[in-house]
């Protein structure tokens, strides 16, 4: 697995707030000291930065946790300052349920989801103004976006001077004791976290422990959210295919310990009433999904033949051969079971075995795809992919925005420290205690709804692998889920947005013509799926009450592969300074480095880029089935780019 950083910089440094472009001092924040622990506090500020609907409130802030020498067995000698952005529901917030949103990475900010996928606003191409998102997920649900683990996005451990290279998308710790260096197109300065990989969670399970502490504080002590509805859901994406099952099952386990009085510490006995786990294009378990990295580029519903039969066979061989991907995964999991049963990642031998497994599988599965020059997050787009747009990075660089947010740090889309920490212990090769598919089964047995939603153009966590996960679960409803067929997802009177297999509380949905960030491609379809699940309706029509019909199952075909899609036109290239490594050509990067590029609102106007070649197809391109539809439902702005980098992070 490869990792990348991307920072939006308003150019602050510690002790240099008077310099032009630096965010002003944090002022006007409300401070709430915990009634349970004097060292714990919440700071927050109300604002209308993104949600401009009259009467609908939103708040940005941090939950501040001190170091802890025994965090459920984990020694944590660093502070955690976790950023949140809370949006009340546009309709009846007092009685609306609440959903947490988490992006993946590991190390990616949830501002990706907020601004590129499902939040109340889209950022326009001037990187300064917003457009209302009528398909926002806070239409009927209170939404809580969290940057986690520590050092991700606006979350931080300690304020640190940094420089940021737009050329290689990297953050460096800086010493400004002799003055702040001059800035140019390729080098920016700012304030961030320590960049210390030891000052953040080092695996998924430890991240679950941290987010549970955040939730205990926020749901008990954040004064602006006192609902009549105490249901909590988690929706997540990408590496969230691991976060979601692990976090939700950890919450559920802690609930059980609170109920049986195993946990009795004051301030840590709040029941988190779990309702739904939603996973969008999740990378859940390589044991189920590894083969899809060969299958999807070779045989997909768009007729794109990125791999030859020889390349496909070679990857499958590397997965199954002795000392191949599966062998290494099995050795890692056995070593972790014996040497790190509590998932502290403090056993150097286990860490080395699992890091080797993770790196080896990455090499076997993903290295061949680099040669295709196709998008990791959208196989129909070029590698330098200008969709969805990165304009929110410039937006979050504005001094006025940072002031309204009350943020002491610049925005960092990707936390390198988190990537290094997780990669160093081989987190992607490991399961948690039950395994992530076991977590999903446990949640279903506990009455929690689970929805797997996959856009059908994503390579990195593709729908073919996601479907294999859905069919590989072992729970009491397995046979009934397998017997269910695929039904159309009816979005409106004229559009079918995908196909869904559902039995009771469990579902798998393939969303047509969507890449990795499904709501950014198909806002209306995604909102319908989200709200139907959240309010106990069947996903196919939204007309049946699943709570009243727990044995409901969809009927239809056993497979969705017969429904083909047309390849969309390639997006217009847009080189964006704050996503240069993922959106710009080598010529443009050279001009940025030399300072000769012409830049307007962070967009490189000169030198211009030409549109990339279309993806390779089979001799006869498939025709779109009537149910697939070909009109992409997009935001009302020119949706352009998320970083798709040669150094890769799951979003």
Swiss-Prot record:
Name of the top EC class for this enzyme: hydrolase
MF annotations from Gene Ontology: serine-type carboxypeptidase activity
Compartment(s) where it occurs, according to its Swiss-Prot or TrEMBL record: Cell membrane
Predominant location category: membrane
Biased composition (Low complexity): 618-627
Entry EC number(s): 3.4.16.6
Catalytic activity as recorded in UniProt: Preferential release of a C-terminal arginine or lysine residue
Annotated region (Disordered), positions in chain: 607-627
Enzyme active site: 238, 458, 516
Presence of keyword Disulfide bond: yes
Residues that, per the record, bind substrate: 461, 517
Keywords: Carboxypeptidase, Cell membrane, Disulfide bond, Glycoprotein, GPI-anchor, Hydrolase, Lipoprotein, Membrane, Protease, Signal, Virulence
Family, as annotated: Belongs to the peptidase S10 family.
Protein name per Swiss-Prot or TrEMBL: Carboxypeptidase S1 homolog A
Organism listed in the record: Trichophyton tonsurans
């Amino acid at each position: 697995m490869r990792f990348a950083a991307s920072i939006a910089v308003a150019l602050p440094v510690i002790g240099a707030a008077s310099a032009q472009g630096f965010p002003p001092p944090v002022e006007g924040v409300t401070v709430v000291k915990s009634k349970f622990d004097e060292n714990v506090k919440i700071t927050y500020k109300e604002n209308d930065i993104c949600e401009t609907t009259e009467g609908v409130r939103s708040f940005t802030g941090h939950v501040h946790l001190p170091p802890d020498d025994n965090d459920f067995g984990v020694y944590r000698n660093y502070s955690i300052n976790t950023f949140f952005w809370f949006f009340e529901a546009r309709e009846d917030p007092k009685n609306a349920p609440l959903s947490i949103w988490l992006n993946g990475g590991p190390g990616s900010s949830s501002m990706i989801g907020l601004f590129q996928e499902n939040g109340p606003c889209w950022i326009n191409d001037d990187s300064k103004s917003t457009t209302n998102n009528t398909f926002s997920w806070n239409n009927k649900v209170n939404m809580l976006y969290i940057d986690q683990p520590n050092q991700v996005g606006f979350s931080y451990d300690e304020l640190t001077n940094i420089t940021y290279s737009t050329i290689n998308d990297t953050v460096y710790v800086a010493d400004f004791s002799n003055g702040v260096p001059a800035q140019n197109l390729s080098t920016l300065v700012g304030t961030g976290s320590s960049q210390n990989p030891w000052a953040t969670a080092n695996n998924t399970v430890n991240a679950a422990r941290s987010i549970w502490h955040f939730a205990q504080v926020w749901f008990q002590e954040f004064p602006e959210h006192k609902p009549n509805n105490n249901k909590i859901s988690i929706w997540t994406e990408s590496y969230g295919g691991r976060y979601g099952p692990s976090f939700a099952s950890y919450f559920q386990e802690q609930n059980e310990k609170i109920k049986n009085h195993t946990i009795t510490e004051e301030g840590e006995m709040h029941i988190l009433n779990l309702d739904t786990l939603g996973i969008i294009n999740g990378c859940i378990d390589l044991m189920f999904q590894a083969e899809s990295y060969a299958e999807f580029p070779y045989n997909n519903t768009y007729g794109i033949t990125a791999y030859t039969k020889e390349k496909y066979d070679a990857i499958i061989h590397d997965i199954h051969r002795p000392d191949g991907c599966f062998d290494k995964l099995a050795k890692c999991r056995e070593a972790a079971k014996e040497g790190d049963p509590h998932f502290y990642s403090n056993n150097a031998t286990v860490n080395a075995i699992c890091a080797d497994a993770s790196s080896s599988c990455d090499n076997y599965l993903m290295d061949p795809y680099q040669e295709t020059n196709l998008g990791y997050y959208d196989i129909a787009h070029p590698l330098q992919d200008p969709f969805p747009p990165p304009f929110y990075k410039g937006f979050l660089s504005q001094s006025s925005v940072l002031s309204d947010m009350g943020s002491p740090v610049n925005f960092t889309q990707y936390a390198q420290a988190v990537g290094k920490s997780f990669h160093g212990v081989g987190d992607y090769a490991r399961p948690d205690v039950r395994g992530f598919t076991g977590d999903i089964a446990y949640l279903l047995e506990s009455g929690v709804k689970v929805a797997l939603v996959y856009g059908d153009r994503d390579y990195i966590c593709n729908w073919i692998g996601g479907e294999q996960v859905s069919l590989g679960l072992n729970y009491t409803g397995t046979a009934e889920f397998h017997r269910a067929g695929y039904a159309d997802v009816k979005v409106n009177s004229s559009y079918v947005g995908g196909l869904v297999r559902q039995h009771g509380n469990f579902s798998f949905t393939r969303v047509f013509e969507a890449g990795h960030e499904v709501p950014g491609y198909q806002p209306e379809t995604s909102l319908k799926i989200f709200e139907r699940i959240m309010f106990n309706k069947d996903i196919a029509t939204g007309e049946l009450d699943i709570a009243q019909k727990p044995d409901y199952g969809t009927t239809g075909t056993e497979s969705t592969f017969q429904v083909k899609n047309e390849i969309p036109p390639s997006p217009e290239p847009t080189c964006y300074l704050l996503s240069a490594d993922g959106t710009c050509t080598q010529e443009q990067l050279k001009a940025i480095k030399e300072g000769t590029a012409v830049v307007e609102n962070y967009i490189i106007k000169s030198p211009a880029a030409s549109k990339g070649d279309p993806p390779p197809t089979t001799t006869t391109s498939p025709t779109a089935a009537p149910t697939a539809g070909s009109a992409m439902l997009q935001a009302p702005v020119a949706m352009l780019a998320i970083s798709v980098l040669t150094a890769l992070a799951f979003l």
